[in-house]
């Protein structure tokens, strides 16, 4: 489930079905800013605002605020009791703010992906002159591929610098990656999807998707690494039994994985995805994100 409010100014309240976990992401053009969140619990109480993030041209950091029932862990809000909304307050006017919660367990979408594979520029996360890139730049590289697909000239080092979270010294903060896409003139959100069938709906609409996966041993045949606790790849198309992906850690980048295996390691890792589109397609992006349907009895 995804909620997006465009041009909310400095504050917004985003209502969602009862949940205990969410990702809040935002788009803003301002070079400096800060975000605080207030969880609106399902019992009608409202938690005290928690600091979520601060950013400036030279430093971006997540802020792990917490109270007795709610905590922020880098880019995920977790609550011990259900909430039905999140209030967002920003020191700068926002272009957009979004709240994503996991879809219900009985949600599904019909597999489609009838279109030809999308022409997503293949980029490797191993960048000469940046020794840290090979082991840790999958997220900014995947985002750079999405940006270039949409006509934004983005270098991998620039993206890595723009999404770096100094609190945990990494480039994989989901909200920061969405914010960077927004700062480059696109609409970027971090969302929960139901699985590869859900991803296929975006591919059908001409929108590649970056998905977060993890695996061990033989869970993902053909993977470039024996295991990963978190890795980003871009899904650009489908064959009957395979997903066509750009894997920034793969020697060839453009490769394919068994669709069922990739679906399992995607859903097991939470089903988080980067959704990037032109701003004028925001409503369509939200509609696609929310098209999971209850399974018929």
Specify the residue positions occupied by each region the protein language model found:
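Short beta-strands within extracellular/lumenal beta-sheet-rich domains
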Residues: 5-17
């Amino acid at each position: 489930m995804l909620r997006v409010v465009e041009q909310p100014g400095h504050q917004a309240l985003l209502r969602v079905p009862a949940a205990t976990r969410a990702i809040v992401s935002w788009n803003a053009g301002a070079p400096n800013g800060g975000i605080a969140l207030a969880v609106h619990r399902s019992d009608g109480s409202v938690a005290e605002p928690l600091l979520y993030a601060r950013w400036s041209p030279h430093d971006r950091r997540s802020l792990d605020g917490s109270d007795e029932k709610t905590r922020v862990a880098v880019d995920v809000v977790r609550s011990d009791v259900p909430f039905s909304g999140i209030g967002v307050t920003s020191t700068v006017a926002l272009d957009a703010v979004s709240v994503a919660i996991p879809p219900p367990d009985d949600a599904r979408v019909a597999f489609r992906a009838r279109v030809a594979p999308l022409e997503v520029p293949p980029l490797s996360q191993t960048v000469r002159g940046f020794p840290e890139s090979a082991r840790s730049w999958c997220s900014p590289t995947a985002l750079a591929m999405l940006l270039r697909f949409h006509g934004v000239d983005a270098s991998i080092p620039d993206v890595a610098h723009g999404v770096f979270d100094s609190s945990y010294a990494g480039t994989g903060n989901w909200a920061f990656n969405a914010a960077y896409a927004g700062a480059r003139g696109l609409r970027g959100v971090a969302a929960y999807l139901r699985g590869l069938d859900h991803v296929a709906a975006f591919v059908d609409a001409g929108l590649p998707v970056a998905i977060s996966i993890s695996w061990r041993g033989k869970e993902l045949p053909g993977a470039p690494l024996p295991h990963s606790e978190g890795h980003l790849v871009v899904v650009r198309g489908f064959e009957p039994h395979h997903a066509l992906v750009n894997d920034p850690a793969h020697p060839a980048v453009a490769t394919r994985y068994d669709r069922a295996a990739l679906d399992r390691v995607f859903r097991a890792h939470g089903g988080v995805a980067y959704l990037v589109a032109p701003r004028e397609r925001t409503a369509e992006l939200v509609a696609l994100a929310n098209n999971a349907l209850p399974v018929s009895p």
